[in-house]
Amino acid sequence: MSTSTSDLIGTLYEAVSGKPELLDAVLTEDWEDIPLVPGQQPGRAGARSLIEGLGKAFSGLRFVVEEIIDARGDDGNGMVGVRTRVHGVHTGELFGIAPTGRATEVRTHDFHQIVDGRIVRTHHMEDWLSWLQQVGSWPSN
C-alpha cells in the first residue's frame, strides 16, 4: 500500500470522525455514496450533512481503521477496501431512537473507488443491527 493511499484513507476517516472540512481533499464533488442514507443528498455536500448529523447523534464519534486492502492498479486507480470500528456515545436522536447515553461500537466495511487520487464512489455496509441491540432497541438473543 502506498503512502498516498494511507494518507487518503486516513484523511477520509478523520473527516467522517467530525472534520467534514477535510472532505474536499479526498472526495470528488459528485462522489457517489452507495447506498444513500434515507434523506441524504448525493455528492460531497451530502457527505457533509451526514457527518454533521452523526456528530449530533454521537459524542466522541471516532472511526478506527483496522484494515486497508489496496487493490488499485499500477496507475493508482481502482478499489480500496477498508474495515473500521466506529465508536461513540449515543447522545442524540438517530433513526428515531432517543439518546440513551450508551457507549456503542459499530463495525463497517467500505469499498472506495479511487480515480486520479480522489474517491469517486463508496459502497458501504454498517452493522446497524448490533447498534440497535447496544442501545436496547432490538432483542440481543
Where does each model-flagged region fall?
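C-terminal and inter-domain tail/linker signature
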Residues: M1-N141
